[in-house]
A protein has these predicted regions:
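Conserved N-terminal structural segment that caps and organizes enzyme catalytic cores in eukaryotes
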Residues: 1-133, 138-210
Length: 210
C-alpha cells in the first residue's frame, strides 16, 4: 500500500485520542519555522517540542555558499549531558536549560567529558549544504552555527515510534527531577504521568473537553 504523506499523517494521528492530538499543537508543528541565516550566527542547544523529530532544510540554490554545521547528542545520552551541564553550570543549572535555547556548548568539551562511572557523551557533527535536509531524531539535543547567508525552514514530525521514544525521555527527566528537586515546566519533555497524556482517561475526567 502506497500512501501520500497527507494520508499517512492522517492515519497516524487517528491512532491518538482527539484530546491528546489537541496537545500537539504549535508553531513548527502545524506550520514551519523560517529562520534567517547569517555567517557566524548560532542556534543554541535544544530538544524539540514534545521530543519530536525535526526536518530542516536550507533554502538556497545548490551552488551557493550557504552552509550550517550541526552538533547533536542522541537521546540515550541525555542523562549524561545533564550531568555535564550540572557540573559546568553549577548554581545556574535548571532542569529546563536545554528547552530555553540559551546555551551554546563547545562540542569538543562535551565529547571529552567523562562521568564518574567513566561514561562518555556521544557528539556527532553534520555539515548541511544548500538545499540539503537534516532530520533530527526524537529527543536528540542539537545545536550549531550558520556559515552563510540564506534561509532555513524547519518543521517537526512524529511517526508511530515517537511515543515509545518520548516515554524514554520522560523517564530520564523523572530521574532528573528526583536528583535535582526541580520540576520541568517546558513542553519539550511531556510528563506522561499526567492524566492529560493518559490514553485511557476521558476528557471529562480531567476537567473539560477539547
Amino acid at each position: 500500500k502506497v500512501m501520500s504523506s497527507k494520508t499517512r499523517e492522517s492515519d497516524e494521528q487517528s491512532n491518538l485520542p482527539q484530546r491528546i492530538r489537541s496537545l500537539l499543537w504549535g508553531a513548527g508543528i502545524i506550520s514551519p519555522w523560517l529562520y534567517l541565516m547569517n555567517p557566524g550566527s548560532v542556534f543554541c542547544c535544544h530538544i524539540e517540542d514534545y521530543a519530536f523529530g525535526s526536518a530542516n532544510v536550507i533554502i538556497a540554490p545548490p551552488g551557493s555558499h550557504t552552509w550550517a554545521a550541526w552538533y547533536s547528542v542522541p537521546r540515550h545520552d541525555i542523562g549524561y549531558l545533564h550531568e555535564y551541564l550540572r557540573e559546568m553550570l553549577g548554581d545556574e543549572y535548571t532542569i529546563d536549560c536545554l528547552e530555553q535555547r540559551k546555551i551554546w556548548l563547545d562540542p569538543a568539551s562535551v565529547s571529552a567529558w567523562t562521568s564518574k562511572e567513566g561514561k562518555r557523551i556521544h557528539v556527532y557533527r553534520h555539515l548541511q549544504g544548500p538545499s540539503e535536509y537534516i532530520a533530527t531524531d526524537y529527543g536528540s539535543v542539537h545545536w550549531g552555527v550558520n556559515l552563510g547567508i540564506g534561509w532555513k525552514a524547519a518543521v517537526n514530525f512524529a511517526f508511530p515510534d515517537w511515543w515509545e521514544a518520548a516515554q524514554g525521555i520522560h523517564l530520564e527527566y523523572k530521574k532528573l527531577e528526583k536528583a535535582t528537586g526541580q520540576k520541568r515546566s517546558y513542553r519539550s519533555v511531556p510528563d506522561f504521568d499526567s492524566k492529560k497524556w493518559d490514553t485511557t482517561t476521558s476528557a471529562d475526567e480531567i476537567g473539560g473537553t477539547c
